[in-house]
C-alpha cells in the first residue's frame, strides 16, 4: 500500500472529507486529492502535519 492509499484509509476511518482534512491541516482540498491519488508527494513536514490532524504519527504510519 502506498502513502496516498494509507492516508485516504486513515481519513475515511476518521469520517473526514478531503475538505475537512484540508481545513484542519491548512492545505487545499486539491492537494489532499492529489496526494491520495499519488499525483503529488507531501514533504515530511506536511505528511507529519497531515498525520497529526488524523490522530496518527509517522511511527504509526510506517
Listing of model-derived features with the role each one plays in the protein:
Residues 7, 21-22, 32-35, 61:
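Conserved hydrophobic/aromatic packing and binding residues within compact polymer-binding modules
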